[in-house]
């Protein structure tokens, strides 16, 4: 399994409960595809965006690390793209050391 870094920005108007549900859904996808959630740097919280995205000037930032197969990344990417809760996301494979 490879190690990945995933950063995503959620809509700032989401309730805390919606944010938690969205994050739990992503963790479930990682686990369902045989992956392993490593850790999250969720302390960033709500930050101002460099430019407006869909009329939002702020977003809720999260940075995650996880291990998984390429199929895990494909499914995460697919789910994030069809969800209205995400403004932006990126998933990067970490280099092996």
UniProtKB/Swiss-Prot annotation:
One GO process term, biological-process aspect: translation
Keywords of the record: Ribonucleoprotein, Ribosomal protein, RNA-binding, rRNA-binding
Gene Ontology MF term list: small ribosomal subunit rRNA binding; structural constituent of ribosome
GO CC terms of this entry: cytoplasm; ribonucleoprotein complex; ribosome
Domain of life: Bacteria
InterPro entries: Ribosomal_bS6, Ribosomal_bS6_sf, Ribosomal_S6_plastid/chlpt, Transl_elong_EF1B/ribsomal_bS6
Annotated Pfam families: Ribosomal_S6
Keyword Repeat included in the entry's annotation: no
Function: Binds together with bS18 to 16S ribosomal RNA.
HAMAP family to which the protein is assigned, alphabetical: Ribosomal_bS6 (MF_00360)
Record-stated family: Belongs to the bacterial ribosomal protein bS6 family.
Name of the protein in question: Small ribosomal subunit protein bS6
Organism this protein belongs to: Syntrophomonas wolfei subsp. wolfei (strain DSM 2245B / Goettingen)
Gene: rpsF
């Amino acid at each position: 399994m490879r190690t990945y870094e995933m950063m995503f920005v959620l809509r700032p108007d989401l309730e805390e409960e919606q944010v938690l549900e969205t994050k739990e859904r992503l963790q479930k996808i990682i686990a369902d595809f045989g992956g392993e959630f490593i850790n999250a740097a969720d302390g960033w919280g709500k930050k101002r965006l460099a430019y407006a995205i869909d009329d939002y000037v702020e977003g809720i930032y999260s940075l995650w690390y996880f291990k998984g197969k390429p199929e895990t990344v494909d499914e995460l990417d697919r789910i994030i793209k069809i969800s209205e809760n995400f403004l932006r996301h990126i998933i990067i494979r970490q280099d092996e050391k």
